[in-house]
A protein has these predicted regions:
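Cytosolic catalytic domains that perform sulfur/thiol-centered chemistry
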Residues: 1-109, 130-132, 136-148, 155-168
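Long, charge-dense
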Residues: 110-123, 131
Length: 169
């Protein structure tokens, strides 16, 4: 799947900045259709008033935010530009953004299943390929030289994962 991302000129995550900050597809840019406060407001309205009221306000906010992106980030792209658009599940938010870009004339594509589907694909791929690797665990007391051993193994060209080093221990 990741190799297929090369078919696109850009990968656009339209989720809120908070969602994007938690995790996103590597290399994606964040052009949110709802900011953090707007997303919370829509969620509250959906649960406390009605889905209809939330969708009505959401459509107005999303439309306004897409217009802002068109007048700023997306101003200079040529007609041949090919963006891939995604949100959490590949539904309303990315659907609205993709629809507008396609109506303009760009060849926008919506990521089926959204970020949730992307994560599922990556996890499934890791689970399928895990048996192709040989994992060796090096353990020992603090100060016993585990990091030094891993560094030597890495210098020989082997792939290593130094969890203590990553944790700055």
């Amino acid at each position: 799947f990741l190799t297929e991302l090369d078919r696109f000129d850009i990968v656009i995550d339209v989720r809120s900045p908070a969602e994007f900050a938690l995790d996103h597809i590597p290399g994606a840019v964040n052009y949110p259709v709802l900011n953090n406060e707007e997303r919370a407001q829509i969620g509250t309205l959906y649960k406390q008033v009605s889905p209809f009221a939330a969708k009505k306000l959401g459509a107005a906010l999303v439309s306004r935010n897409i217009a802002n992106h068109l007048e700023s980030h997306l101003l200079d792209f040529p007609r041949e530009w090919r963006p891939l658009i995604y949100c959490w599940r590949g539904g309303e938010r990315s659907g609205a953004f993709t629809h507008i870009l396609n109506r303009i004339g760009w060849k926008a594509m919506q990521l089926e299943g959204g970020y949730q589907g992307f994560r599922r694909t990556v996890i499934d791929g890791l689970e399928r390929s895990a048996n192709q690797f040989s994992f060796q665990v090096i353990c020992g007391m603090t100060g016993s030289g585990k990091t030094r051993v891993l560094q030597e193994i890495g210098a020989l060209g082997a792939q290593i994962l130094d969890l203590e080093g990553l944790a700055v221990h």
